[in-house]
Amino acid sequence: MIPRGLLYTEWKKNQWLFLCSGILLMAANPFMVYNNYSTYQECLNNPALQDCEFVVNYTNGSPLSFSWVVSVIIAVFLLGLERTKGTMDALLSMPYSRGQIFQTKFWLGGAVIVVPQAIGYGAASLLISLLKPSHTYDFDHFSIGMIVISFMAYALLMASGALTGHIFAQLLTAFTVTVLPFLLIGLPAANLEVVFDFSVGDQFSFISSYIESRLFIFVTPIGYVFNDWIRERDLVLIIPIVMSLVFYLIGYVSFLKHSNERNGRFFLWRKLDRPVQILVIAFAVMGFGVFGYGVTDTMFGYLAGIIFGAIIGFFISYFTVYRKSKHM
């Protein structure tokens, strides 16, 4: 149950952001249809141009492809900015439970992202039925998909915001999660190829088949930043729906369990510090090792890259994970 008073407080706090975001998301889809129609009319009015055709083609995306950016901004304002400014304490002192606070923030921001896009989808559908283009390509799949993908991006940022203590930590954690499958699979595979001088794809055929199936791309959130998913089957959208649910549960549980709001730390749960530092150093070692080998094509370059990566990884992890940030 979302308390009405808390909902009003959260709305007033960011009402201009919500209104501007809602208008932008609502207008993007109808604007795309109308812009195509205007281009078609200009073609008809120009005698020098022939073969004019009114087509609505979303196969390569549209301005709505960047709706996930709005999701990121809203999530940062709802959690990361409040933690960085230290205003979360005042919110927690109000007569509401932590669960009610998170639910209100999450579903208010989610509604601002989903509802305007749904209205824009309906308005664009109405325009298409009135203007009658000769062909429409991937309109429904793209429009529904962007609602799902922008909500997934929002849920990811809310989860990272519930785990971390300031804006930079929220954004860096979310970005790391988006590319984590590539880091966990791609970097070790590349290092194996360097050390043992063989092709991982040739030695392990199931890995090659996995990559060729394109599932490797779509189980990572960053795979939906590009427009390749549009050309896949509609069932591909089940993956971001499941990821949205997982991110929501992580964010909800994290917000309930981690009570320190003003400690300025990267992670609110300090038990994450050491494992994350080890991962950062490991990724830096593997990444710089492969880079060193690629530049010199020698094992000396590979070993030099490993040493350099270990040093860089240590300092990056120390100054991001362990060093406390100051509040605004």
Please place each PLM-identified region on the residue numbering:
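Aromatic- and glycine-rich beta-strand/loop motifs that create alpha-glucan
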Residues: M1-L25
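Alpha-helical transmembrane segments of multi-pass membrane proteins
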Residues: L25-S38, Y121
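Terminal transmembrane helical anchor/hairpin motif
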Residues: N36-F54, F182-P275, I281-A310, F315-H327
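Secretory targeting signals
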Residues: L49-N57, L108-F175, V179-A189
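Long, hydrophobic alpha-helical segments
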Residues: Y58-L81
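Short alpha-helical transmembrane interface motifs in multi-pass membrane proteins
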Residues: T59, V69-V72, Y137-F142, L235-V236
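Helix-loop-helix units of permease transmembrane domains in multi-pass membrane transporters
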Residues: L78-V114
